């Protein structure tokens, strides 16, 4: 016979939520750091094309 599951406590729910938030903060800060390095032309491991090169090749 089917038995309902026990309810998750508030503290456990908050702990899981905080772990998820910390993961997202870490990922967001990495993405922001990469964006800053690209904008300041300091990125050494990320290759990209600039608009100047694209516009010169089309003309």
UniProtKB/Swiss-Prot annotation:
Transmembrane segments: none annotated. Residues 1-20 are annotated as: Disordered. This is Large ribosomal subunit protein bL32c. The gene is rpl32. The lineage of its organism: Eukaryota, Viridiplantae, Streptophyta, Embryophyta, Tracheophyta. It is found in: Plastid, Chloroplast. The keyword Plastid applies. PANTHER family: 50S RIBOSOMAL PROTEIN L32, CHLOROPLASTIC (PTHR36083), LARGE RIBOSOMAL SUBUNIT PROTEIN BL32C (PTHR36083:SF1). Its main location: plastid. It comes from Angiopteris evecta (Mule's foot fern). GO terms for biological process: translation. GO terms for cellular component: chloroplast; large ribosomal subunit. Belongs to the bacterial ribosomal protein bL32 family. Keywords: Chloroplast, Plastid, Ribonucleoprotein, Ribosomal protein. GO terms for molecular function: structural constituent of ribosome.
């Amino acid at each position: 016979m089917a038995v309902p599951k026990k309810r998750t406590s508030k503290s456990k729910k908050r702990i899981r939520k905080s772990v998820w938030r910390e993961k997202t903060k870490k990922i967001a800060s990495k993405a922001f750091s990469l964006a800053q390095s690209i904008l300041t032309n300091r990125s050494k491991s990320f290759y990209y094309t600039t608009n100047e090169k694209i516009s010169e090749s089309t003309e």
